[in-house]
């Protein structure tokens, strides 16, 4: 999961980064509202975490500008201001949720997962595709009840495919999701990851086809062919 953190307090930012990275999130941090706006417009994040007290501009202004710019990325406000007026104002400007500092790591992670699931159209933490089950909270994968052990990158790719099931994802989208524009390898690495992911799924699924190649475009996750499932 790719997270943009806009927070000017370096100690708090570092603490939040550690919380998120311990859950294998990719975190990109800035302490300036203007830069946060630029990054939010330019890159595809799963969620933006926004502090309200920034040195160059108000967090409310960051929020308002992003929404006026048609940036639909879910935004979670993290603020030391606990007044009901602050919460109402933040939600009114287009925030998806509001958390008051200090907060517990488990609650932050749970809120992030819930917000991202809703934004992707998944109210539940489990996405099922045929016999394939991806648990977004536990970060586990099963096929017909059998656990499939994936590397971090393999899981991130399958999670993205599951969240956008039925949508063709380009190799550039995978690279951006996995590396966020930092030290990106060549595009062909995506083919390697997909090949390994398919082999692991095939080994426990009776060669049911979940990940389809869309030649010249990318890859898409689809429900396995009904006849193939019946004959398996």
Curated annotation (Swiss-Prot):
Pfam families: Response_reg, Trans_reg_C. InterPro entries: CheY-like_superfamily (IPR011006), OmpR/PhoB-type_DNA-bd (IPR001867), Sig_transdc_resp-reg_receiver (IPR001789), WalR-like (IPR039420), WH-like_DNA-bd_sf (IPR036388). The modification 4-aspartylphosphate is found at residue 51. The keyword Iron does not apply. Residues 124-223 bind DNA. GO terms for cellular component: cytosol; protein-DNA complex. It is found in: Cytoplasm. Is phosphorylated by ChpT-P, likely on Asp-51. Residues 2-116 form the Response regulatory domain. It comes from the Bacteria. Forms an asymmetric heterotetramer with ChpT (2:2). There are at least two modes of interaction between ChpT and CtrA, only one of which is competent to catalyze His-Asp phosphoryl transfer. This is Cell cycle response regulator CtrA. The lineage of its organism: Bacteria, Pseudomonadati, Pseudomonadota, Alphaproteobacteria, Hyphomicrobiales.
